[in-house]
Amino acid sequence: AEQPWADQPGADQRGAIVCLSPERFLQVRGSKVLTQPIKGTRRRGLDAAQDEELKQALCESEKDRAENLMIVDLLRNDLGSLCITGSVTAEKLFELQSFNSVHHLVSTISAELGPGQSPLDLLRNCFPGGSITGAPKIRAMEIINELEPNSRSIYCGAIGYFGFDGQMDTNITIRTLLCEQDQIYCWGGGGIVADSECELEYQESRDKVALLLSTLQELKASSAQSD
């Protein structure tokens, strides 16, 4: 699968953001709203056989499916407060999408924006994305604020655009590099639930940023050779 929402907003004297996010947060086309949360990750296999095994393990994982469904329910609730009653629909659940370095489970939820509601109203109501807060949303954000000692900066926010024609498209700011003051930062993480295993969650976080880190290592080595 291709990145549905990747961007490089550009650089200025303060730095630059390079975003390769595979996750769509909110899209508005006319009155149709679309959100596509990701929950469930496995790395790509070293060969075709192992890759198929990892795909199957992800698709059959009750834990990953439960996490994904939890976020689907959260986002349906977020959309429901501004969208037409009865229009919020889970079009696809747990769809396997494969990228260069990982496999993901992706669900697709659509709705019809209610009369008098704008894309900006929708973004204000749904931000931050439920796939990176967890549920219950408000309490989860309070706990995150209590436990995390540092700001997430751009990580887990959103990058997007508003068109003069009323369209909007935004992502969840993951798989992203922040370049400032001669430093490059990237972040990786995963959802924590009752049956999470620390080692597996840590490995999932590493898998998500593996391609970014390896690319940076290659660029560093290439730069050193050219010097």
Task: List where the protein language model places each region.
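Extended alpha-helical targeting/anchoring segments
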Residues: A1-D227
